[in-house]
Amino acid sequence: MKQILLTTMMVFLGGLAMSVQANNHYFVQLEGEGDGTSWKDATSNLQEVLAKAKAGDVIWVANGTYTPTNEADRTASFIIPDGVQVYGGFIGEEKKLTDRVLGEAKTILSGEIGTEVPEDNTYTVVYFQNASAATILDGFIITGGYADGLVEGADLTTCGAGIYNNGEYGVSSPLIQNCILMNNFSREGAAIYNYANDGETSPTISDCQFVYNRSDFNGGAIFNDGNFGTCNPTIKNCSFKGNESMYGAGVLNRGLYGECLPVITDCAFIDNFSVVRGGAIYNQREGRGVCEAQLEGNIFEDNGSTIGDGDVDQTNKFLNESPDQPSKAGVRMRSAEAISY
């Protein structure tokens, strides 16, 4: 009898533990009025779902435009919790992730919270902090971030108008894929800012498009900032078009007393423009830092800069390069050359 009771108790406790650890699946639709447990009972409040989501939870967001606040709070952002998977691009009837057809439905995360002028938009649309590789953002259009604050440091009012990935004093390396980042503006890193101050930011950015983003200074699309830390992102199968900045209109990499060793593969850099150097990519080493991009299988076409180099400026590792462009320190390629690696 005691053995039966013991076995029953173990089964009960095991089932209880499984129920406690079970992951939640939330559904978000603009017209939703439910608790978010199914498409039929979807909620319209994405911010509320993000606030209660825990590691292992999954969020599906249907087509439509979502803003981080309905008020005039420019500091509001969509904060993605560590370990949470957030997917957009749904019609609102899919049963499996594979039922989603990318491009069929547009799920937009927008910083347009005020009037039609951008100066009252939210500073940063999406924010990660200490996010592990299990954290996923997939299938969104991210637009309208406007980080025009005074340049006094690497904060959300000046950097990362589209996405701010903060690994300061920790590690933040989420997966960002199948996203379009367009028409974002900031002082630095308009589309994505990876900040590694005394920490690490090594996200994977895959199958994304960066279109018409603009920064006043560094990184029109992406700024990988290895400031006293480690910033080694993987960027693959992405396209960069029409982005603008002072330095590094497509991607700017900086190793300020730290390490910045990005791997950029199978990407296209087309018609990006920098005022000074690096129409496509600029590597900036400061202090005793290390900064070197590994490039493989990329295409550079019609990128330009007023003073310096149109495509890639500074030291890089080139793999599978064409014979007429040998790998060497200080590789400089003019935008008149459409070069494929």
In which residue ranges do the predicted regions lie?
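Right-handed parallel beta-helix
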Residues: 23, 88, 134-146, 171-185, ...
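Acidic Gly/Asp/Thr-rich repetitive segments characteristic of extracellular carbohydrate-active
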Residues: 30-68, 77, 122
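Glycine-rich beta-solenoid repeat tracts in large extracellular/virion proteins
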Residues: 77-80, 124-130, 149-151, 161-168, ...
